[in-house]
Structure formats: C-alpha cells, structure tokens
Regions:
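Basic, Lys/Arg- and aromatic-enriched nucleic-acid-binding interface segment
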Residues: 1-23
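Short, basic (Lys/Arg/His-rich) helix/loop patches that form interaction surfaces
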Residues: 5-8, 99-139
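Alpha-helix N-cap/helix-start motif at helix boundaries, enriched for small hydrophobics
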Residues: 16, 28-33, 137
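Conserved tyrosine-mediated DNA breakage-rejoining catalytic core shared by Y-recombinases
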Residues: 32-64
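Catalytic phosphate/metal-binding cores of nucleic-acid and nucleotide-processing enzymes, i.e., regions
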Residues: 33-35, 59, 89-93, 97, ...
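Short, polar N-cap/turn motifs at the start of nucleic acid-interacting alpha helices
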Residues: 38-42, 133-153, 158
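Catalytic-site neighborhood detector that most strongly recognizes the C-terminal catalytic loop/helix
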Residues: 51-56, 146-166
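C-terminal catalytic core of Y-nucleophile DNA break-rejoin enzymes
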Residues: 54-72, 82-103
Length: 169
C-alpha cells in the first residue's frame, strides 16, 4: 500500500497514510495537523506534539521520531496551512477525499476493504504484534477495554483461526 501511494499517487496521500499507520490517529485528527506544527518541532529539536483528539476530546502525544525526517521534508515543500491541503482553498482535504484516495491506492495494490480506519487498525495491529502490550495500545487508542482493542485490530479472530487451523483430536 505504501508503495502504491508513493509511486503512483501524490506525496500528500502517501504522507497521510504514512503518518496514519505510525500514529494510529483517526483520519479526522490527521487532517487537522498544520504544517507549522511540524516546522516548529524541528526548531525545538523535538519529534512529538500534543493533539486533542476529536472523538474523545482527550489530549494525546503524537511521536513522529521514526518518520520525522520524511514528514519534515514534506512539510517544507508546502505553502499551505494544512499538512494535507485541498486544492480548493486554504483547507485540508475532506474525510471523503481521504477515503477516495485510499480506496484508489488499495485498488491499485489489489487490497480489498480499505477505509479511513485502515491506517488506525494497521497501527494497532502492528503495535500489538511488536510489543504484545494490549494495555498500552488500549490507552493509545483510547478504548475502554482490552477486549475492544483486540477485536478492533482483528487479533481475536486471527488467534482463534490459528488455533482452530491446528486443532485436532
């Protein structure tokens, strides 16, 4: 998916996906990030910033350390307020436009069922696979229970399928 976006779509769409899968933010929160936020981080020599999540209204630290140089290089190319600018005036792209671009890239990469939550779920899935820390992931995603978090990222079904695939009496 990253390859399809990087090679065949705009840098804006690639960066939206890259930041989405590395932060687990909802698309509505991603679209509100301003270019100056990234530029200020470089000046302050830090690679994380606070955001107030739209759905939960909770503040969260967003860490971009692993992708900061790439995000900063992209931000420097923009002459717009928004990190993911629309071509229609000084505003970010809409959630619908983000969805359309992800759908097109998914079709190109032969990936079915791509949506705007795909980035958040991908982050959650790989965070859990790498750390096995469901409590921390639950906190990051602001879920009320570990069970909701595991169901959201598809782990329960995957683990159940793996067990049943090898189950024999």
């Amino acid at each position: 998916m990253k390859w399809a976006l990087k090679r065949h779509y705009s840098e804006r769409d690639y960066m939206l996906f890259l930041i989405g899968i590395h932060t687990g933010l909802c698309v509505s929160d991603l679209l509100q990030i301003q270019t100056k936020t990234i530029v200020k981080l470089k000046r302050k020599k830090i690679k994380e910033f606070k955001i107030k999540e739209g759905e939960t209204k909770k503040e969260r630290m967003i860490n971009l350390t692993s992708i900061f140089d790439e995000v900063y290089s992209y931000a420097q190319t923009l002459e717009n307020t928004w990190l993911f600018p629309s071509r229609k005036g000084d505003q970010p792209i809409s959630k619908i436009q983000a969805y359309r671009q992800l759908q097109k890239a998914g079709d190109f990469a032969s990936i079915e069922s791509i949506g705007t939550h795909t980035m958040r779920k991908t982050f959650g899935y790989w965070f859990y696979k790498q750390t096995k820390d469901v409590a921390m992931l639950q906190d990051i995603l602001n879920h009320s229970t570990p069970q909701i978090t595991l169901k959201y990222i598809g782990i329960n079904k995957e683990e159940k399928d793996n067990i049943l695939d090898n189950f024999y009496i």
